[in-house]
Amino acid sequence: MPTTLRPSPISKGALLVVALLLSLFPARVAVVAQDDDDAQRVERADNFDRAEDEEDLNRELWEYVKGTPYAGVLSYVAAAQARAEGARVAEAVLPTGWKLAPAGRQVELGRLPYEAVPFAGRLVVLNTGYYTREPQEVSVVEPASGRVEKTLRINSLFPSASVGPGGDLYISGGFDSKVYRVNREFNVAHEYAVAGFAAGLVPIDERRLAVLYLAGKDEKGNYVSGRLALLDTETGRVERDADAGYFPYAVRFVGGKFYVTVLGENRLRVFDRELKEVGEIPTGRRPQEMCADGARLYVVNTDSDELTVVDTASGRAAGVLRTNSFGSPFGTAPTSCAVAGGRVYVTLAGLNAVAVYDKRTRQQAGLVPAGWYPTKVLVEGDNLLVLNAKGVRPRRPNPRGPQPSTSVGGPDYVLTLLKGSLSVLPVGDVSARGLASWTRQVLAGAPTFDARRGFKLPVKHVFYVVKENRSYDQVLGDLGRGDGDKSLTLFGRDVTPTQHALAEAFVTLDNFYADGEISVLGHSFTTSGYASPFLEWLGNAAYSGRYRGYPFGMVPSVTSPAYLWDALDDAKVSYRIYGENYYLYTRAYRILSEELGAQSELARRFYARTMSLASETDRGRVFYDFAHTYAGRGDTPADAGRLLADEKFTAGLSNFLVGDGSLAAALQSNVRLRRRFAEYLSRYAFDYRSWDLTHSDLDRFAAWRADFERQARAGAVPRFNYLWLPNDHTNGADTRIRTPQQFVAQNDAALGLIVETISRSPVWRDSLILVEEDDAQNGPDHVDATRIVAFAAGPYVRRGAVVNDRYDQLSALRTAGLLLGFRPLNLNDRMAVPLFGIFDARPNLTPYTAPAPTALSDADRARYEELRRAK
C-alpha cells in the first residue's frame, strides 16, 4: 500500500530543523586490492564522482577510519531513531528554506517520477531516479484511491510514454536503447532494440512508432548527436532515421508532421512523414516537453521561464506564455503542461507549484501549491494530477537509522531518500477563490529576504572556497558546540584542526545546507545557483550507472543559462577562477555562440568536442596538461592577447575546445573574438590543477599563493576569487595515494594556509572568506541529508559565535552579490536569505594563525613545512 500523506498548512514564520539521519551508505565495498595495477588506481583518482563509487565511499571510510566492521554502527541506531522521531513536524522545509504544503491528497511513489500517462483506467508513472543496479520502477496507480496496484521493473527509463492506436502503451527504455510495449494487463508484451539512447516517442499508426535517440555513439565510442527514427513494431526494424540535433527530447505528431524539441539547440525541428526536415521554429532555452490543443503546440522552455506557442498550420511561433513575474531572468523552471477547459496548466519546479493560465489571454490566473519539484501535470476526468519528483518530505526522518545493510541502493544514500509523490485534487477546486488563497500560500512559502535591506559593510574582496562531499556531523560532530553528533564523526579534530579552529574562532554554522544532492548538482549551484530539470534527471541517471559519461559543466545542453562569471562581467567586477572546469567550458561556449552564433561551425565543433570528452569522463587535467607551462603569461587581457599570438599555445587551446585547429584560425582572423578570448583566459589560473586526487591540495595552495602574492604586490587582487579545493573527497579505502585521513588532513591544512595568507595580506581589512562543500552525499548526519560544513572568516565576521540561522549555498551567492554589487543570477539566489547572522559591524583585524596539522602523510608534512618556510 502507498503512504498517503496529508501535510498540515504552512505555519508562517517558522524556521525549523526537521530531523533526518543521513547514515552510512550501505552497499558493495569497492576497496581496490593492493595488487591491482596502477592504471586502476589512476582511473579511480581521475574520475570525478564515479557513479559506482559514490555510494560505496562512506561505508569504506567508516570501516577504515573507525577500524571496526560497518556493523559497529548499530550501537548508535537507537539514539539516532529517537532524535529523528522527536523532531518530526508537519511543515516541510527544503534546503533552500522554501516551505511546502501541497494541495490535495498526496500519494508516495518511487524515486524521481518524471512522466505519467493515463492508460487502461489507471495512471502509469515512470520513476526515473536513482536505483543503482536494481531496475527502475513503473507504478500503476488507481487515482481515485491513490493505491499503487502494480509495479513494473524496467532497468532504464527515459521520461516518455505514449498510448498507441492499437491500445498498447509504449515506454522509452532510455540508456538501454530499448522501447517496451505494455499491454492492458500491465505486462511487458514486447521489447524493441534501437540504435541510440531512447528518448521521446509517439505512435503514428497501429504499426509504426516514432522514437528519438537522445544521443548515439560513433565507431570510436564517442557520443554524437541524436536522431529521429521510425520503428516498425511488427518487424522490430527501424525503417529510416534522420539527424535530429543535439539532445532531441520530445516528439509530437500533429497534422502529418513530427515536431521535435531539440533541448541542446533551443529550437523545434519539423519533419514530414518520410523524416525529411521541412522547417524549424526558434524556442526559448532548453525546450523539453510539449502539450497540444488541436493545431496549437505549447513548447515548455525549462531554462527561460516561458512556453512557446506554436501554430502548426502556419509553422510559426504564435506567441509566448511567460511563467516568471518575479523580476529575475529565470528560475521558475517550467517542466510540463496540460490544456483543459480553457486553461493551460504548467508545472513550475522552481516554485513548487502549478501555474494556471487563461488559454485565450495567456494571463496567469494563479498558482496551486505542489510538492517538491513538480515535473508533470495532467487533467484526467475530474482530477488535477501532479507528479512531484522529490516528493513532499524533503527532510526525511530516517527512523531506521544507519542500517549496516549490504544491499545495493540501501535506504540511507541521499538519492535513495528522495521519493516522489502524486498530488490528486479535484479540478473543480481550482476556482478563482481557491487560486487566490493558494497563490498567497505558495508565495508565503518563499524565503522572506527583502533585497532593499542590503549590506553596508566595506567588504571589497570575497574568497569563495568549494570543497567536496562532507556533511556537518562527519567533520564537526565532535566540535563541542552547535548541533553535532560526535558518534557520526569520521574526520574530527585530530584530522581537521583548521576547520575546528575556524568554527570556534569565527562562526559555527550548524544549519547550513547544500542545494543539490550530488556533485553534478552541487557544482551547478555553487557556480550558477541553479540546476536545470534536465540536469536533475541526467545526474540521477549518471550516478545510478545508467549513463556512462560526464557532460556536466561541459556540454551546453546540461549547463545553466548564466553563471557567476557572467554576472561578475556584467557588473565589471574583477574575478579569478582556480580549478573550476565549469568556467572553462561554459564561458568559451558563450563567447562562441554570442560572437558567431549557436549554429556556427565553431560552436558546433565545440559541441562535438565536449560530447567526445563527456563520453570518457570529466578529465580535470585536460586544460592543465597543455596550459600550465604558460602560467604567468596570460594573467591580464593584454598578456593573454599576446599569448594568443603564440601558435603552439593557440593550437593547444583550439584542440582543447573544438578538437582541431579551426578555433586557432578564427582567433587569428577575428579581432573581436580574439579580444574576448583574451579576457576569458586572463580570468583562469593556468597552473592551478583541477580535479586530480594524485595532485596535492597543498600544491594547489602553492599555485594560488604565488598568484595571490603577485596580485597583492601589484595592488590588483581580484574582487572575487573562486577556489576549488577537492581532495577531502578522498579515494575511499584505497590507500595507495593516501589514506582517507591523510586526504582530508591535506585539504584541511591547505585551507588553513589559504585563510592565514589572506589574513596577513593588505586586503584582509576588506575581505570575506566563505567556505562550503559542494554537497553532503558522502557523509552521515543526524539532522539532514544535505547539511554541510561551511565557514566564514574576515574582519567583519563575528568571533566565537554559534549561528543557528538557516542558510544554504544560495545564501553565500546572494551575500557575495550584495557585497560586490553583482545582480542575482536567477530566482533562486534572488530569493535566498543572505548570511546576515555572521556579520559584526565592528571590524576585528586580528590575523588568523592556522593550527599545526596532525594527520598528514610524510610527503605532505614535508611539503607543508616547505610552504611554511617559504612564506
Residue ranges and their predicted role:
Residues M1-S11:
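N-terminal secretory signal peptides that target proteins for export/translocation
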Residues A14-F25:
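Bacterial N-terminal signal peptides
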Residues G13, A33-D35, R604-R605:
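A cross-taxon signal for low-complexity, glycine/charged-rich
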Residues Q34-F455:
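Predominantly soluble domains enriched in secretory-pathway, periplasmic, or organellar proteins
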Residues L418, A432-K871:
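N-terminal pro-sequences and low-complexity stem/linker regions of secreted or lumenal proteins
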Residues R28-V32:
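Sec/Tat signal peptide C-region and signal peptidase I cleavage site
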Residues P2, R111-V117, V430, D510, ...:
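Short amphipathic alpha-helical segments with coiled-coil-like heptad repeat character
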